C-alpha cells in the first residue's frame, strides 16, 4: 500500500489556475504609464482576454489542461491497481484519496474550461471528458458529455472518496485526509 501512496503524490495537479483566473478577474488593472509593461506575454494575453498561445508558463490553459488530466490519469492507475488486488479493502484509504484527487482535478478543470454551473442550464452546457480508467489505447476519444454529467461524476467520486479516505498519513501535508478533504 505504500507504493500506491507514493504514486498518489503524482495525482495532485502540478499546476493551479490561481494566476490565470486572477488575470481574468476585476482584481487586475492596467497601469497606463509609459514605464509599465506586462510581466510576460501570457499575463498580457490573459489580462486582455485574448486567445492564449503562450505555453511555457505553468498556468497557461494548455499547462493547466495537461497537469490536471495527468493527475486524473495517475488517480485512474491507482484505482485500477487497487481494484485488481485480492486485498483491496486494505487500500480503502488510498482508494478514497485517488477518488478525491480525480474529483478535485476535474472540478478545477471545470472552473477554467466550462460555463459556471447552473442547474437550469447544466443539461445543455458542455462538460468535459471524465476518464475513469487508465488509457490503454492512444488517441481514444472519451465523450465530453454535459456539465450536469460532469458534476454528477465529480460528486460521485467526492462522496465515495470521503467515505473511504483515512484520517492519518505518514506525511499528511501531501495527501488528502478526511480532515483536509472537508
Segments predicted by a language model, with ranges:
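Acidic, glycine-rich segments characteristic of secretory precursors and extracytoplasmic regions
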Residues: 1-28
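Well-ordered alpha-helical segments within folded domains of soluble proteins
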Residues: 71-79, 130-131, 179-182
